[in-house]
Amino acid sequence: MLPNAMASNHVMPSGAPPVLPKADYRNAMARLGAAVNIITTDGPAGRAGFTASAVCSVTDEPPMLLVCLNRSASVYPAFTANGVLCVNVLAAGHQALSGLFGGKTPMDERFAAGRWSRKATGSPVLEDAAASFDCRVVQATSAGTHDVLFCEALAIAIGGAAQSLIYFDRRYHEIAAPPH
């Protein structure tokens, strides 16, 4: 059984927890391969999007996932005000698009580089994504510098791509599903 680290009476055996060097933590996290996603929103606060690898399935009943969003990101106000988003899982060949959404490129230029449609929430859905999850944000929790957005999927699209894009060791890699 795991210890209940959240309990108020829990104390680490050595007293205060050690402070990890930020560079060591970031270097170790670079070894945690992850899918590359473009997260989009549209609504009263405008259209916005960013590249993220901090996305995770939460539950399938109801269908829910989480997205981590830095509170200092320029897109933060649009996402929090709109309350809806689409997680677009990038297929192989989307490295350039990921770079546009991961940098300081103006929003109009980001969206001009892809083909987009809409589903239930009105958030932009990347037409050639490996998969897309169109969601409403049902809960947000602050953790350090980020908000963790819990998102209920209202619609999905599954693309025909047999290859996906992952980020590992600070580089993009393409992976393919084995033949059936």
From Swiss-Prot:
The keyword Transmembrane does not apply. Keywords: Flavoprotein, FMN, NAD, Oxidoreductase. Its EC number is 1.5.1.42. The keyword Oxidoreductase applies. GO terms for biological process: nitrogen utilization; uracil catabolic process. Pfam families: Flavin_Reduct. SUPFAM superfamilies: FMN-binding split barrel (SSF50475). SMART domains: Flavin_Reduct. It catalyses: FMNH2 + NAD(+) = FMN + NADH + 2 H(+). One of its GO terms (molecular function) is riboflavin reductase (NADPH) activity. Catalyzes the reduction of FMN to FMNH2 which is used to reduce pyrimidine by RutA via the Rut pathway. NCBIfam families: RutF. Belongs to the non-flavoprotein flavin reductase family. RutF subfamily. PANTHER family: FLAVIN REDUCTASE (PTHR30466), FMN REDUCTASE (NADH) RUTF (PTHR30466:SF1). This is FMN reductase (NADH) RutF. The gene is rutF.
